[in-house]
């Protein structure tokens, strides 16, 4: 499917970003704690895996074709965004004395937990991409199997931790793992499966059946809700970010959005990404501003008012990023390539050394040596 018909992905970025803000603000706490749990602890957990799966939709097919050549630029962009976001939250970290922790704790935050509570997304995406690249390179079409096993390991350290805690040897193993990271919701356990899921769906034959996929999404949401309520009823969760039915929901969500064949909306990409990055700062600003103007009751104590204020401020501060476009290459520009004659002579010598006694190379120069100059290259080859 052409990228310009995947506007459904762009449009769902906004609800996904708003769900992330909801997780960190609890918009329905003043109305109904139960409804808030449904929204933030169950349905809201679709948001970040959706972002991972969309990244996988575009990245994994390229990893299969190009290998490390596709991984490098992706890591560079992801880690640059992580660095800039970490610098943005450095003042809050200094205020909270977070950086006063031990070196081991700081490394754990940088590589797994994120340097601020929502920034775990960036190291998780980078680490998950590296794992997926290794799995695709080493196992090909079987790359999904270790990813599923990793997710199950993560699941037993998250929503289904109650089962783990009931088995002392297993609990001891997880307690050892939690010395390295605070949660199994990280790039090692939770990210690879969603990247591969997105990549696998991208390479499937496209079927324009939005109604069918919508039914599948609805049923999978029912299963997710039932699982989440079961986990809460039996108090099984150590943290509630991973569910067994979550990949099913995300898969049907991507299929449904892709089947809608909506035009691309690139402005939403930068805007929603900025909302994601900026909203914790906006939580701090709303709380501080409400105290200054005497509106704490409306903008902090009232959960809906607090959520609305944070969303509005985040959306406004993120608005410039909706208009940002990377600079395009000048169509009038010229490209060139330099041929190292010494390297060509070295390669010819090395190939000649592999030939049996009396054998000779017979170079074929075509298409003007692909723009390098047929006469010049022929002279070197015959020399």
What are these regions (language model features)?
Residues 330-383:
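A charged N-terminal "starter" segment
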Residues 1-332:
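Alpha-helical transmembrane segments and their immediate juxtamembrane cytosolic regions
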């Amino acid at each position: 499917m052409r990228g310009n018909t995947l506007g459904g992905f762009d449009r769902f970025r906004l609800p996904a970003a708003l769900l992330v803000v909801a997780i960190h603000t609890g918009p329905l706490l003043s109305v109904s704690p139960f409804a808030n749990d449904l929204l933030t602890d169950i349905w809201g957990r679709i948001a970040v895996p959706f972002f991972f799966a969309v990244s996988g939709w575009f990245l994994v097919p390229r990893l299969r074709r190009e290998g490390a050549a596709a991984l490098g630029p992706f890591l560079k962009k992801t880690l640059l965004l992580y660095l800039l976001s970490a610098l943005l939250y450095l003042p809050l970290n200094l205020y909270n004395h977070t950086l006063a922790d031990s070196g081991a704790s700081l490394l754990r935050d940088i590589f797994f937990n994120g340097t601020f509570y929502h920034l775990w997304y960036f190291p998780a995406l980078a680490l998950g991409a590296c794992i997926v690249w290794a799995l695709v390179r080493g196992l090909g079409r079987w790359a999904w199997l270790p990813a599923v096993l990793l997710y199950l390991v993560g699941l037993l350290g998250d929503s289904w931790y109650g089962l783990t805690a009931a088995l002392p040897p297993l609990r001891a193993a997880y307690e050892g793992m939690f010395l390295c990271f605070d949660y199994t919701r990280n790039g090692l356990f939770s990210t690879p499966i969603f990247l591969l899921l997105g990549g696998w769906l991208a390479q499937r034959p496209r079927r324009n059946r939005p109604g069918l996929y919508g039914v599948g999404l609805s049923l999978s949401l029912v299963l997710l809700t039932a699982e989440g309520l079961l986990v809460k009823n039996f108090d099984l969760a150590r943290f509630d970010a991973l569910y067994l039915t979550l990949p099913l929901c995300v898969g049907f969500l991507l299929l449904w959005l892709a089947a809608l064949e909506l035009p691309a909306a690139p402005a939403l990409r930068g805007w929603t990404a900025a909302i994601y990055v900026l909203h914790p700062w906006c939580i701090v600003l709303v709380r501080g501003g409400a105290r200054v103007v005497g509106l704490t009751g409306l903008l902090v104590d009232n959960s809906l008012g607090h959520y609305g204020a944070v969303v509005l401020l985040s959306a406004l501060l993120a608005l410039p990023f909706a208009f940002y476009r990377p600079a395009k290459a000048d169509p009038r520009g010229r490209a060139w390539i330099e041929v190292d004659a010494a390297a060509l002579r070295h390669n010819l010598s090395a190939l000649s050394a592999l030939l049996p006694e009396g054998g000779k190379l017979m170079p074929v120069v075509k298409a003007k040596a692909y723009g390098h100059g047929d006469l010049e290259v022929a002279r070197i080859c015959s020399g």
